[in-house]
Amino acid sequence: MFDKHVKTFQYGNHTVTLETGEIARQAAAAVKVSMGDTVVLVAVTTNKEVKEGQDFFPLTVDYLERTYAAGKIPGGFFKREGKQSEKEILTSRLIDRPIRPLFPEGFYHDIQIVAMVVSVDPEIDSDIPAMLGASAALVLSGVPFAGPIGAARVGYINGVYVLNPTKAELAKSQLDLVVAGTSKAVLMVESEAKILPEDVMLGAVVYGHDQMQAAINAINEFADEVNPEVWDWKAPETNEELVAKVRGIAGETIKEAFKIRQKQARSAKLDEAWNAVKEALITEETDTLAANEIKGIFKHLEADVVRSQILDGQPRIDGRDTRTVRPLNIQTGVLPRTHGSALFTRGETQALAVATLGTSRDEQIIDALSGEYTDRFMLHYNFPPYSTGEVGRVGAPKRREIGHGRLAKRALLAVLPKPEDFSYTMRVVSEITESNGSSSMASVCGGCLSLLSAGVPLKAHVAGIAMGLILEGNKFAVLTDILGDEDHLGDMDFKVAGTTEGVTALQMDIKIQGITKEIMQIALAQAKEARLHILDQMKAAVAGPQELSAHAPRLFTMKINQDKIREVIGKGGETIRSITAETGTEINIAEDGTITIAATTQEAGDAAKKRIEQITAEVEVGKVYEGTVVKILDNNVGAIVSVMPGKDGLVHISQIAHERVRNVGDYLQVGQVVNVKALEVDDRGRVRLSIKALLDAPAREENAAE
């Protein structure tokens, strides 16, 4: 019934198993990948026909996590999985990025990849198995895919690279890097690091690429065994006559356009060139396919002009050489009522970054397959359509916005203060108000500045820069601080963020095969030079953390004995509610007895802290207290005196006065304030007090007689 094929190989400390032919047999190809107890089912479906008018490659990647994989039932009212989580979106992008450049130009058939996590080992992340499964399934589907690709996670522990580290190992690692590529070249890198030098980062990329050959070889052997039917697809031939016509009509205008340094004016000139081509070559009788071909030729012509100018040593689109960073403008404290803000402008790219401080109650609760946890630092990136001068939809963040926000967040994580040193929850929002290249790296710079503006004691300043590459044969040029057009028309997008001491995040997407270790070395060195230049200007604008905003909450931390937590909370929360209401504060109590008080003023925080200290204080034997009589006991035994909130003691009738007391009521009344001395606290916490011990003893009668 099943034509099942299985391939097993060792990958670091894990055994990986690839299986096909048993599940999802109606898909073009389906592979079940097991890595330890983590199992991912990846299915590829294709469309043999191209949609009419299609002029781009419609690749869709969806990575989905099923809660049953971790033995859980979804929370919420509906009790089923809903929209994709941030982790699912980021992993979908991680699968997509190294695969997309391996499809040939002109291939416009629909391809859909669905990677579904059906079992999860909390120690083994499902992203690497999902990437390997997508690679294997594409090879088995027979589509014109220049793979397979391999994927590896690399850690760096005690100066040693670790292949596919577990979650426990990653907690000790200075690096979390995912690299993907073919047998010959690296195609994608995604990483965060704890301020590591460039050579260590490059070494990790090379190490990961070397190690992933085991996975690539296994997928090739697996495909040989399955022997899939390969598509008979040929790339459309270039219409040289049509290319010559388009060049003749628009070639010179395109060259003139790319000498214009201002983006909007340049775009207007390019529109003029395209309108001339449309008027000459596209009529009402021209079908969509032919129109798309003409449009494609025009775009190629644009790329040829930009690329050849740069490789010939001519100035770039905006007049810069290959190593110059665009002019910077840095302003902080630009929004009066926010906790921290910065406006970071680099050329025609601008980010308005705003930092907000909160308490532990504001931490984001993340219900992941591996377990629930909280996150004290959030960075959200917004890319409104007006940032590029366009009209567009405004709504929920797109995948790109989530990916860019995650990269900027990873860049800043290494310099955040420890929770014990700075117990605030932090949120940064980066509003991209202008965009012409590398808005994610502007978010890193702006995010760092806004945190400093909010008074966050960062360990160091962090800056980011985007690098580009143009490669033709043996000639290449590495570009610093790329523009949007250079990103689209170039061969690499290489983003590096870090401090003066090292790298905190690195992201690389390569559109071609053939980028060598030497080119990556040059790009990293050039990126460092640019990063240091930006850091100098950032430090000149903001040397260190500013004073806490008057509008930010003040946090006061204190530690109490765990046995006292119940007393602070009170019956049904009565005590803690009264403290928060009377002092206007917010109080959080951790299980270990750590109390965090959030207040808008120093006075309110001090008042709440004093109340808690009074509640949790112990009565000390021998100490004198000012107390209030709260009750006269029956049978003339004595009186109960409150010496501090929640702490009462007994003044026995014999401890009221030196003379014989016949009636307690003759000496004490409820509400009377008296000074008492603590005589004893027994094993059950009962307190004995004395008024008499503070009174002078009367002179003896015989002394008086003399």
UniProtKB/Swiss-Prot annotation:
Tell me which CDD domains the record gives.
KH-I_PNPase, RNase_PH_PNPase_1, RNase_PH_PNPase_2, S1_PNPase
Q: Which InterPro entries match?
A: ExoRNase_PH_dom1, ExoRNase_PH_dom2, ExoRNase_PH_dom2_sf, KH_dom, KH_dom_type_1, KH_dom_type_1_sf, NA-bd_OB-fold, PNPase
* Gene3D superfamilies according to UniProt: GHMP Kinase, N-terminal domain, K Homology domain, type 1, Nucleic acid-binding proteins
**Entry keyword set:** Cytoplasm, Magnesium, Metal-binding, Nucleotidyltransferase, RNA-binding, Transferase
Any GO BP annotation: RNA processing
EC number in record: 2.7.7.8
Annotated S1 motif domain residues: 622-692
Q: Which residues bind Mg(2+)?
A: 487, 493
A Gene Ontology cellular component where this protein is annotated is: cytosol
Limits of the KH domain: 553-612
Provide a Gene Ontology MF annotation, just one: 3'-5'-RNA exonuclease activity
Q: What is its cofactor?
A: Mg(2+)
What Pfam families does the record point to?
Answer: KH_1, PNPase, RNase_PH, RNase_PH_C, S1
Q: Where in the cell is it found?
A: Cytoplasm
**What catalytic reaction does the record list?**
RNA(n+1) + phosphate = RNA(n) + a ribonucleoside 5'-diphosphate
Summary of the function given for this chain in its UniProt record = Involved in mRNA degradation. Catalyzes the phosphorolysis of single-stranded polyribonucleotides processively in the 3'- to 5'-direction.
Family membership noted in the UniProt record: Belongs to the polyribonucleotide nucleotidyltransferase family.
Protein name in the entry: Polyribonucleotide nucleotidyltransferase
Organism expressing this protein natively: Neisseria meningitidis serogroup C (strain 053442)
